[in-house]
C-alpha cells in the first residue's frame, strides 16, 4: 500500500552540520535545526511516515569511525523518539563521492524496495534536504523536493500542508460552468456565483469553517437560480470529499450550536452514507435573489456529494439570521469533523 512519506536528509536538514569537518561524531556537535521537531510532529498528525536518507562520507574509516558516528546518531534517535518521532527506515551511504557507488544520493539504490513495490504515494510524498543532490533525488523518485535553507521548517510545513488536504474540481453542464478550489487547512476566499446573498452564505462556510474556498460559477440565471445553487453544492461537496482523501486521522463527527437571536444546530458524520434531516421554516420566499426553498436543496445536494449524514435545524424570527445560522452551524461542524485528531481511521470497519 502506498504511503505518504517524507524522505528526510539528516545533516544540515534535521540536525546542524558543523562547517569545520562536516561530521557529527560527538554529543557536543548534536544540535537540532530550528522547528524541525515541531514540524515533524505536526506532519505526523496528518499521516506522514518518515524515512531518513543520508550520505555519510567515509563512515567506518579511520577519518570517521563508526562508533563515534553512532554515539551522536543514537542520541538523536532517542531524543526524537521521546518526542514521538520515529523513522520507518534509515538509509545511510558510507561511501565517498569518488567511489561512484550505486547507493549515494541522488542515486536511488538505497530506496529500491520503495520504488519496486510502490511503497510511497508520489502525489503526497516529498524529499526534504539542504543540498542539490536531495532535489535530484526527489526528481529521481518522482516526488517534489523541498530545499531546507531556502525554506525554513515552518515554511516546509506550510508548503506540504497547502498541497495536502486541498483539491480542485470543475463541473460543466449545459446550464452551468463551475470551478471550485478547497484547502481544508485555510487559505484564500473568493466566491462569485452571480447570486449575492448566496455568495454571502458560502463565505460563512469558509470563514467559520477555517478553510480556503474559491468558487466561480457561470449559470443560467436568466432562467432562475436553481441550476447554479444545485450545481455549486454538488461541485463543493465533491471537492471537499476529494480534499479529504483517505480520511485517515479525521475526527469524522462534527456538532455545532451557534446562537444569536436564533438557534441553529448542525450534526455531521462523514460516514459515506448520505442523508439529510432538515428543519427550517422561512417567512420570505427569497433572501436577495436566493429562493429560501433552495437552501434545503443546497444542503441536500451538498450532503450527497460529500457523502455525509447531515442534520440541520434552526429556530428564530429573522429569516436572514436563520439562513446565516444554518451556514455557520454547518461550517463549525465541518471544521470539527475534518480536524486531524489521530493517525487512525475513525471506523471499526477500516473504511469510511
From Swiss-Prot:
<feature type="binding site">
    <location>
        <position position="95"/>
    </location>
    <ligand>
        <name>Zn(2+)</name>
    </ligand>
</feature>
<dbReference type="InterPro" id="IPR005954">
    <property type="entry name" value="HisB_N"/>
</dbReference>
<keyword id="KW-0378">Hydrolase</keyword>
<comment type="pathway">
    <text>Amino-acid biosynthesis; L-histidine biosynthesis; L-histidine from 5-phospho-alpha-D-ribose 1-diphosphate: step 6/9.</text>
</comment>
<dbReference type="GO" id="GO:0004401">
    <property type="term" value="F:histidinol-phosphatase activity"/>
</dbReference>
<keyword id="KW-0028">Amino-acid biosynthesis</keyword>
<feature type="region of interest" description="Histidinol-phosphatase">
    <location>
        <begin position="1"/>
        <end position="164"/>
    </location>
</feature>
<keyword id="KW-0479">Metal-binding</keyword>
<dbReference type="InterPro" id="IPR038494">
    <property type="entry name" value="IGPD_sf"/>
</dbReference>
<keyword id="KW-0460">Magnesium</keyword>
<keyword id="KW-0456">Lyase</keyword>
<keyword id="KW-0963">Cytoplasm</keyword>
<feature type="binding site">
    <location>
        <position position="103"/>
    </location>
    <ligand>
        <name>Zn(2+)</name>
    </ligand>
</feature>
<dbReference type="Pfam" id="PF08645">
    <property type="entry name" value="PNK3P"/>
</dbReference>
<dbReference type="GO" id="GO:0046872">
    <property type="term" value="F:metal ion binding"/>
</dbReference>
<dbReference type="GO" id="GO:0004424">
    <property type="term" value="F:imidazoleglycerol-phosphate dehydratase activity"/>
</dbReference>
<dbReference type="InterPro" id="IPR020566">
    <property type="entry name" value="His_synth_bifunc_HisB"/>
</dbReference>
<dbReference type="GO" id="GO:0000105">
    <property type="term" value="P:L-histidine biosynthetic process"/>
</dbReference>
<dbReference type="InterPro" id="IPR036412">
    <property type="entry name" value="HAD-like_sf"/>
</dbReference>
<dbReference type="GO" id="GO:0005737">
    <property type="term" value="C:cytoplasm"/>
</dbReference>
<feature type="binding site">
    <location>
        <position position="11"/>
    </location>
    <ligand>
        <name>Mg(2+)</name>
    </ligand>
</feature>
<feature type="active site" description="Nucleophile">
    <location>
        <position position="9"/>
    </location>
</feature>
<feature type="binding site">
    <location>
        <position position="130"/>
    </location>
    <ligand>
        <name>Mg(2+)</name>
    </ligand>
</feature>
<comment type="pathway">
    <text>Amino-acid biosynthesis; L-histidine biosynthesis; L-histidine from 5-phospho-alpha-D-ribose 1-diphosphate: step 8/9.</text>
</comment>
<dbReference type="InterPro" id="IPR000807">
    <property type="entry name" value="ImidazoleglycerolP_deHydtase"/>
</dbReference>
<feature type="binding site">
    <location>
        <position position="93"/>
    </location>
    <ligand>
        <name>Zn(2+)</name>
    </ligand>
</feature>
<dbReference type="InterPro" id="IPR013954">
    <property type="entry name" value="PNK3P"/>
</dbReference>
<feature type="binding site">
    <location>
        <position position="9"/>
    </location>
    <ligand>
        <name>Mg(2+)</name>
    </ligand>
</feature>
<feature type="active site" description="Proton donor">
    <location>
        <position position="11"/>
    </location>
</feature>
<keyword id="KW-0368">Histidine biosynthesis</keyword>
<dbReference type="InterPro" id="IPR006549">
    <property type="entry name" value="HAD-SF_hydro_IIIA"/>
</dbReference>
<feature type="binding site">
    <location>
        <position position="101"/>
    </location>
    <ligand>
        <name>Zn(2+)</name>
    </ligand>
</feature>
<comment type="similarity">
    <text>In the N-terminal section; belongs to the histidinol-phosphatase family.</text>
</comment>
<keyword id="KW-0862">Zinc</keyword>
<protein>
    <recommendedName>
        <fullName>Histidine biosynthesis bifunctional protein HisB</fullName>
        <ecNumber>3.1.3.15</ecNumber>
        <ecNumber>4.2.1.19</ecNumber>
    </recommendedName>
</protein>
<comment type="similarity">
    <text>In the C-terminal section; belongs to the imidazoleglycerol-phosphate dehydratase family.</text>
</comment>
<dbReference type="InterPro" id="IPR006543">
    <property type="entry name" value="Histidinol-phos"/>
</dbReference>
<feature type="region of interest" description="Imidazoleglycerol-phosphate dehydratase">
    <location>
        <begin position="165"/>
        <end position="352"/>
    </location>
</feature>
<dbReference type="InterPro" id="IPR023214">
    <property type="entry name" value="HAD_sf"/>
</dbReference>
<dbReference type="InterPro" id="IPR020568">
    <property type="entry name" value="Ribosomal_Su5_D2-typ_SF"/>
</dbReference>
<keyword id="KW-0511">Multifunctional enzyme</keyword>
<dbReference type="InterPro" id="IPR020565">
    <property type="entry name" value="ImidazoleglycerP_deHydtase_CS"/>
</dbReference>
Amino acid at each position: 500500500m502506498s504511503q505518504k512519506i517524507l524522505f528526510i536528509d539528516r545533516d544540515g536538514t534535521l540536525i546542524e552540520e558543523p562547517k569545520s569537518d562536516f561530521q557529527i561524531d560527538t554529543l557536543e556537535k548534536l544540535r537540532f535545526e530550528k522547528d524541525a521537531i515541531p514540524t515533524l510532529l505536526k506532519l505526523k498528525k496528518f499521516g506522514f511516515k518518515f524515512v531518513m536518507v543520508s550520505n555519510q562520507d567515509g563512515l567506518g574509516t579511520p577519518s570517521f569511525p563508526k562508533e563515534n558516528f553512532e554515539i551522536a546518531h543514537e542520541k538523536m534517535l532517542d531524543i526524537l523518539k521521546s518526542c514521538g518521532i520515529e523513522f520507518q527506515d534509515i538509509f545511510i551511504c558510507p561511501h565517498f563521492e569518488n567511489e561512484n557507488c550505486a547507493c549515494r544520493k541522488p542515486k536511488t539504490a538505497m530506496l529500491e524496495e520503495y520504488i519496486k513495490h510502490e511503497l510511497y504515494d508520489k502525489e503526497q510524498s516529498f524529499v526534504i534536504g539542504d543540498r542539490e543532490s536531495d532535489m535530484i533525488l526527489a526528481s529521481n523518485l518522482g516526488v517534489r523536493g523541498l530545499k531546507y535553507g531556502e525554506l525554513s521548517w515552518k515554511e516546509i510545513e506550510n508548503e506540504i500542508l497547502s498541497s495536502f488536504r486541498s483539491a480542485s474540481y470543475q463541473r460543466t453542464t449545459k446550464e452551468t460552468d463551475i470551478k471550485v478550489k478547497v484547502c481544508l487547512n485555510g487559505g484564500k476566499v473568493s466566491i462569485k456565483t452571480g447570486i449575492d446573498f448566496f455568495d454571502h452564505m458560502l463565505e460563512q462556510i469558509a470563514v467559520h469553517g477555517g478553510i480556503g474556498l474559491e468558487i466561480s460559477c457561470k449559470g443560467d440565471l436568466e432562467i432562475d437560480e436553481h441550476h447554479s445553487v444545485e450545481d455549486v453544492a454538488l461541485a463543493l461537496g465533491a471537492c471537499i470529499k476529494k480534499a479529504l482523501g483517505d480520511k485517515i486521522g479525521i475526527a469524522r463527527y462534527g456538532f455545532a450550536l451557534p446562537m444569536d437571536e436564533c438557534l441553529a444546530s448542525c450534526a455531521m458524520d462523514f460516514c459515506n452514507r448520505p442523508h439529510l434531516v432538515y428543519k427550517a421554516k422561512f417567512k420570505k420566499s427569497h433572501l436577495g435573489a436566493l429562493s429560501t426553498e433552495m437552501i434545503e436543496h443546497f444542503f441536500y445536494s451538498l450532503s450527497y456529494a460529500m457523502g455525509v449524514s447531515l442534520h440541520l435545524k434552526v429556530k428564530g424570527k429573522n429569516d436572514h439570521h436563520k439562513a446565516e445560522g444554518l451556514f455557520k452551524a454547518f461550517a463549525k461542524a465541518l471544521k470539527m469533523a475534518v480536524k486531524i485528531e489521530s493517525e487512525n481511521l475513525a471506523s471499526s470497519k477500516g473504511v469510511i
